[in-house]
Swiss-Prot record:
The active site is at 399, 513, 654. The lineage of its organism: Eukaryota, Metazoa, Chordata, Craniata, Vertebrata. Residues 38-1403 are annotated as: 4 X 308-326 AA approximate repeats. Undergoes proteolytic cleavage in the ileum. This is Phospholipase B1, membrane-associated. Repeat 2 contains the catalytic domain. Its EC number is 3.1.1.5, 3.1.1.4, 3.1.1.3. Sequence repeats lie at residues 38-346, 361-706, 707-1053, 1063-1403. Calcium-independent membrane-associated phospholipase that catalyzes complete diacylation of phospholipids by hydrolyzing both sn-1 and sn-2 fatty acyl chains attached to the glycerol backbone (phospholipase B activity). Has dual phospholipase and lysophospholipase activities toward diacylphospholipids. Preferentially cleaves sn-2 ester bonds over sn-1 bonds. Acts as a lipase toward glycerolipid substrates. Hydrolyzes fatty acyl chains of diacylglycerols with preference for the sn-2 position and of triacylglycerols with not positional selectivity. One of its GO terms (cellular component) is apical plasma membrane. It holds the Pfam family Lipase_GDSL. PANTHER family: PHOSPHOLIPASE B, PLB1 (PTHR21325), PHOSPHOLIPASE B1, MEMBRANE-ASSOCIATED (PTHR21325:SF52). It catalyses: a 1,2-diacyl-sn-glycero-3-phosphocholine + H2O = a 1-acyl-sn-glycero-3-phosphocholine + a fatty acid + H(+); a 1-O-alkyl-2-acyl-sn-glycero-3-phosphocholine + H2O = a 1-O-alkyl-sn-glycero-3-phosphocholine + a fatty acid + H(+); a 1-acyl-sn-glycero-3-phosphocholine + H2O = sn-glycerol 3-phosphocholine + a fatty acid + H(+); a triacylglycerol + H2O = a diacylglycerol + a fatty acid + H(+).
Length: 1463
């Protein structure tokens, strides 16, 4: 098909009918100044010649720079009109002088450019003007060459031998026959071509030091005239010997080939070997697009600039078409390549020679399907159509279906014009499946008598095309005549029975529509695109009986840019940009590119809507199925990460035979995949296995037969078990699994899965056969469950449940889940399961491999608020541990899936978001502790925290390695349930169709997705498992591979359990930006900003002196680390130590009064005493006043002071010694006395009173003896000796509640609101604070000191953060709890709107009081009461925790008998 090197120039008829004669004017060789007065100002000169640093003139033409050029000259013909700046001459004179003026205009611009590099460049030279009567052809060009040589030799300003000359030889190929792909290789032009070559040889012999541009201006000169009715006209294809109409593809390929032929000729000529002479072909081609408008004439300035830009590009990269619209910016020589480019310094290699490389073998395959038989009788329904029933095949489309370039050898770009229809993916049938993979060759394996496929090469009307009616360059509108032609051919062909034979017709279109979209957005709109497809499909639907039509979705074409833009890949970019300019030319991130991507998606979406509208499913013997395998196509990559151009034809646009083969495999796979589960993404880097029809359901998939109900398609070819039963769980294949079992609650039991919408009463029915992890109803084709997936690998699987019934029903088999079950009941389920497996004769207990799925936790959360202790995360952890321990101890050969439970927030969203569909009136019965909580409430936050603790405890248990001690047992956490994406309806409400009628239990759609997600997780490596489930996603079932054939465990995933990095300090990051103090020192405490505070102080007990904040060197004595104290410590800076003073230092670095170190001398205004009780507060207040009055560092009257009072731990600890002598009234009275002293003695003071807490002893819970000072703690805190149910502890709860109630009133005491410069604010963050827990759900010891009664530095940091944040919250709206989660950015900032510390007055919350004496807001008392109840419960935790610790020391029990604390 290609040209031989010896006939490169001749073979393409390069010069048309001759060299156009030149118009000249006598003797003129200089420019008339008035013709182009604005030449230089037409474009900015952006180059910097000085930066090139070139001084010495070049000795070689291959290192010739613009600065070396002394003279610019031209010979040849230019019939280009002057630009708008030209003077108005007489029409006839202008016509005669146009060529000469065009030449002088162009050369002047070039001279102007060169003058910036070499100011001494001479005036340009053009051939003398002669009248039209004496125009010749090549002879005239020879005459001009001789005259030029003569004038150069006579020019006194030019050193003819030493000066470098730039000579431009213009010619015009007056015929477009070179655009004809089948142009004659011999003709009358040979002599003219030889003469042109003779002219170049003449210049080479006569002119030393010359760089010659060979420029064909035919398209620039002639193309506008095709539209003007002049003597020049486009030659007809017949006149050139073309076989038919010249297409856009023909045009762009032949343009490229024309240019490449010139380059190859010149590169291989003797010119390229010279040091003082070079000839370079400079192309001028228009962009090839739809002829919608007349191409505008080009002024000489634009032509000269385009020529200059071409000279600045290496040969082989001159791929920018001549623009008819915009003037492109001028290019500059680079420092790396400052010279004019020749063939030698461009390292040019002809692509016409590269094509001779060895052609890669075509890609075949093998089909090993067990069932290749047709239906027993010819089917009458398209929905029961087997592959072997197909007798006829056809196709419609464009060049990708016509097979352009599919068989071309690498580099043979000209051969892309050949249509290799026999290799076409959807319709070709060259050879057979072993060497050529196409859809017909696949189908011929099922029915060797298939008809209609194309073979060999040729156009759509060739004999070999048969029913392949695709046409290169076709768009969607061309499908209509193609469909008409195909129908006529089928009706009239005698080898087929038009009425009886089953037909497959594949339609694929859209690439050309997208490539030309920007040229004509209206014609190529998505609406017109799909309307044209509709009309074509309507013809098939109306006239073709017994047809299955593949409508292949248009490909994602934007990825072609990746191939085009990667300069490391050799591609003919001139061809690419001409074929698909709308895709390749827009800038990255441009609106044009975004528009294209959007249109591409709309093409796909509207096609999808058309096919799925049901328009073509009105007859039993006809259907159209959308095949989306091209929807998301990535460019194939090489092993080096480069775009793989072996996947493409030599033009880098069409498919190679390899990609045709992979497209065929992908189409076949799509045809067998269920609708809704079809593969949509491919990259074609690797071959695609030919899958077989499912033996249970062997039909081509349609919208009506596609997987029925809730089935799934499994495409795995490798389904064999291990050669011998594995002994290691880490080498377990799916086909090795013999037994499935499940444990859990109503979700696993299947409650309500099959219930009809609205049938709430039926939710109690346990549809175990549909359960995601253990159901075995139906088959995978209509019911997706884990057992049904595993049965595809091992048909002898057992253990799964069928039908309905409770756990004791024989249908349940090894599904021992019980509705309503909580974690504490899991151990009982395990024992029952183990016994059933041991007793059942169908199970070889010791030899059979088992998969056991465990899911529990939802019911614990539904009941957690009824007993916080019983449903604590620690107990959840222990129950789970006990159950798994039994499995680990008792069950051989088992893989246990531990599945995360459904987050209760999902339940709330669905249930509360659909009050008209969900039984909201039964919320308290169904799941009270989840569904009845108020939004943004403390209780809801507590539930969320407990949920996270449950999840963390599961992860911690598995990652402890406890169950990795045996080779035949493993527990794997499958986290797909961790994050659920709910389907949301258009009205914004969650879609209840995924749930049972109670809106709590999942329905069958939900269970189907759970099964798929579980299977995906089981094949994903540990550490890389999907932890998100989108309920609306198309989840395909992955397959084990030869490289990774096993169910994944930590060991075969090479996974190492993570270790948490140590935290270096407990500092905080300060993100506040408004640090300035008030413009003037405020006189009102209600206008007090943090930066106004000058002094800090504190009163309290050992929690304020920071006893035990750091580990002590002495085993007998805990040290007071006052510098780390939460409310008064000032050691270091905030970045390493979070304390209230260190926060305030960020606002005022000169703040005074804070403690440092451990000594009394550096305590500052920290007057707290370790053993202090409330009764000691007045004394501490007096001590503080005296210290302040005595200090010379502060101005007592003017400085603003922040004082924090926190007391009560010792009072409550000693309450049990003598309950009668401890009352809430007495406690508050002492506090009030201290506040009175401060009120009377200290001006300008803001007093924080922190609510009491008694939860510290809860640290003993679950610590297994962590606390080293248990007995001393009891002696220090006598209440720890009592049982939680004892009367004294019950009384302590009441006292605690009373204390907090009375304390909350202090902010509202009328006395403390009388002064403008004094305020008392109760900070309640401790009111509802929960014990900080670790990941296992046990009390986190890092918050506490060695004696377990005081805070560590981490605990002090959390208290400081909570106190600071309380200070920035309005009274009545303060946070009453602290969740102790670590975060360096938890500190709040004052806002521009509210820059002050909050007091009662500036909180705008002073209530209307009916009783002045009380001074208490009723709402606040109520809130305090609620908070006090919880704190009372925490007091109970204190005692029970210690009692549990005693029990553990007295009796070490096995894990399943760990005592449960009953709070």
């Amino acid at each position: 098909m290609g040209l031989q090197p010896g006939v490169l120039l001749v073979g393409l008829l390069l010069l048309g009918q001759g060299i156009t004669q030149i118009h000249t004017s006598s003797g003129k060789s200089t420019l008339e100044g008035q013709l182009w007065p604005e030449t230089k100002k037409n474009f900015p000169f952006s180059c910097s010649p000085k930066k090139l640093g070139l001084n010495m003139p070049s000795e070689s033409v291959h290192t010739l720079t613009p600065a070396d050029i002394k003279l610019i000259a031209a010979i040849g013909d230019m019939e280009t009109p002057p630009d708008s700046g030209a003077v108005n001459l007489d029409t006839s004179e202008r016509t005669e002088k146009e060529p000469w003026r065009g030449c002088m205009g162009m050369m002047t611009v070039l001279s102007d450019i060169i003058s910036h590099f070499n100011p001494s460049v001479l005036l340009p030279t053009c051939p003398p003007w002669r009248s039209a009567a004496v125009r010749g052809g090549v002879e005239e060009l020879r005459t001009q060459a001789e005259e030029l040589v003569s004038s150069l030799k006579k020019n006194p300003q030019l050193d003819f031998q030493q000066d470098w000359k730039l000579i431009n030889v213009f010619f015009s190929n007056a015929s477009l026959c070179y655009l004809c792909p089948s142009a004659h290789e011999n003709g009358p032009l040979m002599s003219n071509m030889d003469k042109l070559a003779g002219i170049l040889h003449y210049l080479h012999q006569e002119v030393p030091r010359a760089f010659v541009n060979l420029v064909d201006l035919f398209e620039v000169v002639a193309m506008p005239r095709w539209h003007q009715g002049t003597m020049l006209s486009r030659p007809s294809p017949e006149a050139c010997g073309c076989s038919g109409e010249t297409s856009k593809l023909d045009t762009v390929v032949m343009q490229w080939s024309y240019q490449e032929t010139w380059d190859s000729l010149l590169a291989s000529s003797s010119f390229n070997d010279q040091e003082s002479f070079a000839v370079v072909f400079q192309p001028f081609f228009y962009e090839v697009s739809s002829p919608v408008e007349e191409p505008p004439s080009q002024d000489p300035t634009t032509l000269a600039l385009s020529l200059w830009n071409n000279m600045m590009k290496p040969v082989g990269q001159k791929d920018e078409p001549f623009s008819t619209i915009e003037r492109r910016p001028m290019k500059c020589p680079s420092q790396e390549s400052p010279y004019l480019f020749t063939y030698r310094n461009s390292n040019y290699q002809s692509r016409l020679l590269k094509r001779q490389r060895q052609h890669k073998e075509r890609e075949g395959t093998e089909i090993r399907c067990p069932d290749k038989d047709p239906s027993d009788s010819t089917p009458t329904s398209v929905h029961r159509l087997k592959p072997a029933d197909i007798k006829v095949i056809g196709a419609l489309g464009d060049s990708l279906t016509a097979g352009n370039g599919a068989g071309s050898r690498p580099g043979n770009i000209l051969d892309v014009l050949t249509e290799y229809r026999g290799l076409s993916w959807s319709i070709g049938a060259d050879h057979n499946i072993s060497s050529v993979t196409t859809l017909p060759n696949i189908l011929r394996e099922f029915n060797p008598s298939l008809k209609g496929f194309s073979t060999g090469t040729g156009k759509a009307n060739s004999v070999g095309a048969f029913f392949n009616q695709a046409v290169a360059g076709a768009r969607a509108g061309d499908l209509i005549p193609q469909a008409r032609t195909l129908v006529d051919l089928m009706k009239n062909h005698t080898s087929i029975n038009f009425e009886e034979d089953w037909k497959i017709i594949t339609v694929f279109i859209g690439g050309n529509d997208l490539c030309d979209f920007c040229s004509d957005p209206v014609t190529n709109s998505p609406e017109n695109f799909t309307d044209n497809i509709r009309q074509a499909l309507d013809i098939l639907h109306a006239e073709v009986p017994r047809a299955f039509v593949n409508m292949v979705k248009v490909l994602q074409i934007v990825n072609l840019r990746e191939l085009y833009k990667d300069s490391r890949v050799s591609c003919p970019r001139l061809i690419l940009r001409n074929l698909c300019r709308c895709v390749l030319l827009p800038d990255d991130n441009s609106t044009e590119l975004e528009s294209l991507i959007d249109i591409n998606k709309k093409y796909q979406e509207r096609t999808h809507q058309l096919i799925e509208s049901g328009r073509y499913d009105t007859r039993e013997d006809f259907t159209v199925v959308l095949q989306p395998f091209f929807e998301k196509v990535d460019i194939p990559k090489t092993s080096e990460g480069l775009p793989d151009n072996t996947s493409f034809a030599p033009d880098c646009f069409h498919f190679s035979s390899k990609t045709h083969a992979r497209a065929a495999s992908a189409l076949w796979k799509n045809m067998l995949e269920p609708v809704g589960q079809k593969t949509t993404q491919n990259n074609f880097e690797n071959s695609i296995d030919i899958i077989c029809p499912n033996q249970a359901f062997p039909y081509l998939s349609t919208y009506k037969n596609g997987i029925e109900g809730h089935g799934t398609w499994l495409t795995c070819r490798e389904r064999t078990p291990s050669a011998s039963p594995p002994t290691s769980v880490h080498a377990l294949r799916p086909a090795d699994v013999r037994v499935v079992a499940a444990l859990g609650d109503s979700l696993t039991a299947g409650s309500g899965i099959g219930s009809k919408p609205g049938d709430l009463a039926d939710v109690i029915t346990q549809y175990r056969g549909l359960s995601y992890s253990s159901g075995g109803d139906g088959s995978l084709m209509n019911v997706t469950t884990l057992p049904n997936i595993l049965r595809e690998f091992n048909s002898n699987l057992t253990g799964y449940a069928v039908g309905t019934g409770d756990a004791s029903n024989t249908n349940a088999f090894l599904n021992q889940a019980v509705p309503g079950a909580k974690a504490e009941e899991l151990m009982s389920q395990v024992k029952t399961l183990v016994q059933k497996m041991k007793d059942d004769p169908r199970i070889n207990f010791h030899e059979d491999w088992k998969v056991i799925t465990v899911l529990i936790g939802t019911n614990d959360l539904c009941n957690h608020c009824t007993d916080l202790d019983l449903y604590s995360s620690a107990n959840f952890f222990n129950h789970l541990l006990n159950a798994l321990d039994i499995l680990h101890r008792e069950v051989p050969r088992a893989l246990v899936n531990l599945v995360d439970f459904m987050n209760p927030s999902i339940m709330r969203q669905v249930f509360l978001g659909n009050p008209d569909k969900c039984p909201v009136q039964q919320a308290s019965i169904l799941c009270n502790c989840v569904l009845s909580l108020r939004e943004n409430s403390y209780e809801l936050a507590r539930m969320d925290a407990l949920t996270r603790a449950y999840q963390s405890s599961m992860r911690e248990l598995v990652e402890s390695g406890r169950y990795d001690t045996r080779e035949d047992f493993s527990v794997v956490l499958q986290p797909f349930f961790l994050n659920i994406r709910l389907p949301i309806l258009e009205d914004g409400r969650p879609d209840t169709s995924f749930f049972a009628p109670d809106c709590i239990n999942p329905g069958q759609k939900f269970h189907s997705q759970l099964s798929r997600a579980l299977w995906v997780n089981m094949l994903e490596p540990v550490g890389s498992k999907t932890d998100t489930l989108d309920l609306t996603a198309d989840i395909s079932l992955p397959c084990p591979t030869q490289e990774e054939p096993f169910l994944r465990t930590p060991q075969n995933s090479d996974y190492t359990y993570p270790t948490k990095p140590a935290i270096e300090n407990w500092g905080s990051d300060f993100l506040c930006t408004e640090w300035k103090p008030s413009n003037s020192v405020p006189t009102s405490v209600h206008k007090l900003q943090p930066a106004d505070i000058k002094v800090v102080a504190a009163l309290g007990d050992s929690l304020t002196t920071a006893v035990g904040a750091r580990a002590s060197n002495s085993s007998d004595l805990l040290m007071s680390w006052r510098g780390l104290s939460w409310s008064i410590g000032g050691d270091g800076a905030l970045e390493t130590h979070t304390t209230l003073p260190n926060i305030l230092k960020k606002f005022n670095p000169s703040i005074f009064g804070f403690s440092t170190g451990t000594l009394e001398e550096t305590a500052g205004f920290n007057v707290a005493v370790e053993e202090a009780r409330a009764r000691d507060m007045p004394a501490q207040a007096r001590d503080l006043v005296e210290r302040m009055k005595a200090s010379t560092e502060i101005n007592l009257e003017m400085d603003w002071k922040l004082i924090t009072l926190f007391i009560g731990s010792n009072d409550l600890c000693h309450y049990c010694d003598n309950p009668e002598n401890h009352s809430a009234e007495e406690y508050v009275q002492h506090i009030r006395q201290a506040l009175d002293i401060l009120y009377e003695e200290l001006p300008r003071a803001f007093i924080n009173v922190v609510d009491i807490i008694m939860e510290l002893a809860g640290l003993h819970q679950g610590q297994g003896g962590h606390c080293t000072a248990l007995l001393p703690a009891q002696s220090t805190c006598s209440c720890l000796r009592h049982f939680p149910s004892s009367p004294v502890i019950q009384e302590l709860k009441k006292v605690t509640w009373n204390l907090q109630s009375d304390m909350s009133r202090l902010s509202y005491q009328e006395k403390y609101t009388q002064r403008e410069d004094f305020a008392v604010v109760v900070q309640p963050f401790f009111q509802n604070t929960l014990i900080p827990l670790d990941k296992l759900g046990s009390t986190d010891p890092t918050f506490f000191s060695e004696d377990c009664l005081h805070f560590s530095e981490r605990g002090h940091a959390e208290m400081a953060i909570a106190l600071w944040n309380n200070m920035l919250e309005p009274v009545g709206h303060k946070t009453t709890f602290n969740n102790f989660t670590y975060n360096r950015t938890k500190l709040k900032c004052p806002s521009t709107e509210s820059p002050y510390l909050y007091t009662l007055q500036n909180s705008l919350s002073l209530p209307v009081q009916t009783e002045k004496a009380s001074g208490v807001a009723p709402g606040i008392v109520s809130a305090a009461a609620a908070g006090g109840l919880l704190v009372g419960l925490i007091v109970g935790i204190l005692a029970v925790s210690l009692w549990s610790s005693f029990r553990r020391r007295q009796k070490k029990s096995p894990p399943e008998s760990v005592p449960v604390a009953n709070f």
